[in-house]
């Protein structure tokens, strides 16, 4: 199942994350490190909302959500462009939160794990 959604700059990042989770050893490592279900809800420049569920509690999977976002251990709500910056280490999650650009519902400590997950599962070559 595709995790990409037209109109969202973060779609390629979710594809990369999904590709990283395809490596079961990496997926289990992420599950062990995070142990949470993270719901990521993004809003694009047209105002459309889309959610993805990152299951790092059981099996290390990523799924696009059709309809309302389900409840997870933590939900991250932010703009598409800000998520791209966060995932690419261009901005700190704490800074986004303090500036009101990142809303967190649920377990705040689990929310801090998302940056580490992207670093660990990033399939791009390290230069």
Swiss-Prot record:
Residues 33-41 are annotated as: Hydrophobic. Coiled coil: none annotated. Induction: By alkanes or fatty acids; repressed by glucose. GO terms for molecular function: lipid binding. GO terms for cellular component: cytosol; peroxisome. Keywords: Lipid-binding, Peroxisome. InterPro entries: SCP2_sterol-bd_dom, SCP2_sterol-bd_dom_sf. Pathway: Lipid metabolism; fatty acid metabolism. Residues 43-52 are annotated as: Hydrophilic. Pfam families: SCP2. Residues 14-119 form the SCP2 domain. One of its GO terms (biological process) is fatty acid metabolic process. It is found in: Peroxisome. PANTHER family: SCP2 STEROL-BINDING DOMAIN-CONTAINING PROTEIN 1, STEROL CARRIER PROTEIN 2 SCP-2 FAMILY PROTEIN. Is involved in beta-oxidation of long-chain fatty acids. Its exact function is unknown, but possesses a nonspecific lipid-transfer activity, despite the absence of a cysteine residue thought to be essential for the activity of its mammalian counterparts. Monomer. This is Oleate-induced peroxisomal protein POX18. It comes from Candida tropicalis.
């Amino acid at each position: 199942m595709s995790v990409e959604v037209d109109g969202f700059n973060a779609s390629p990042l979710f594809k990369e994350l999904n590709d990283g989770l395809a490596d079961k050893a990496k997926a289990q490592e992420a599950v062990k490190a995070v142990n949470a279900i993270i719901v990521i809800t993004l809003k694009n420049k047209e105002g459309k909302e889309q959610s993805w569920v990152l299951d790092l509690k059981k099996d290390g999977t990523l799924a696009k959500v059709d309809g309302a976002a389900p409840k997870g251990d933590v939900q991250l709500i932010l703009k598409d462009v800000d998520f791209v910056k966060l995932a690419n280490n261009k901005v700190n999650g704490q800074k986004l939160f303090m500036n009101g650009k990142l809303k967190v519902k649920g377990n705040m400590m689990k929310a801090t794990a998302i940056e580490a997950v992207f670093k660990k599962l990033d399939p791009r070559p390290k230069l």
